[in-house]
Amino acid sequence: MFKATARYIRVQPRKARLAAGLMRNRSVVEAQQQLSFSQMKAGRCLKKVLDSAIANAESNENIKRENLCVLEVRVDAGPMFKRMKSKSRGGRAPILKRTSHLTVIVGERGQ
């Protein structure tokens, strides 16, 4: 099993989980194709993390990418940047800029 992570990514976890659903339980070649045609910002971020996990597998254990599949995709919520928006009559409302931690684990089929 080979793991790659990206932390503090400026993508909402809820939207990133939608993109993560495109690559679950697929071979890495299929997952790369799905993410490369995805219009979502989270899809681009997940593709970079997937490419990193594939590179880890190829460089550390000399495993061919055709034998790899996506074992686990995890999207966790990171810290939120808090901003304020002015409202009427001198009030204000919070704006939460959400971040995500992305984790992709790949391995050989049958693990």
UniProtKB/Swiss-Prot annotation:
Under Pfam families, the record lists: Ribosomal_L22 (PF00237)
GO BP: any one term: translation
InterPro entries reported for this sequence: Ribosomal_uL22, Ribosomal_uL22_bac/chlpt-type, Ribosomal_uL22_bac/org-type, Ribosomal_uL22_sf
Is the keyword RNA-binding assigned to this protein?
yes
- Record flagged with keyword Signal: no
Q: What Gene Ontology molecular-function terms does this entry list?
A: rRNA binding; structural constituent of ribosome
List the GO terms this entry assigns under cellular component, sorted alphabetically. cytosolic large ribosomal subunit
Keywords for this protein: Ribonucleoprotein, Ribosomal protein, RNA-binding, rRNA-binding
The protein's role, per its UniProt record: This protein binds specifically to 23S rRNA; its binding is stimulated by other ribosomal proteins, e.g. L4, L17, and L20. It is important during the early stages of 50S assembly. It makes multiple contacts with different domains of the 23S rRNA in the assembled 50S subunit and ribosome.
Assembly? Part of the 50S ribosomal subunit.
Q: Which NCBIfam families match?
A: rplV_bact
**Entry's family note:** Belongs to the universal ribosomal protein uL22 family.
Protein name (Swiss-Prot/TrEMBL) = Large ribosomal subunit protein uL22
What broad taxonomic lineage does this protein's source fall under?
A: Bacteria, Pseudomonadati, Chlamydiota, Chlamydiia, Chlamydiales
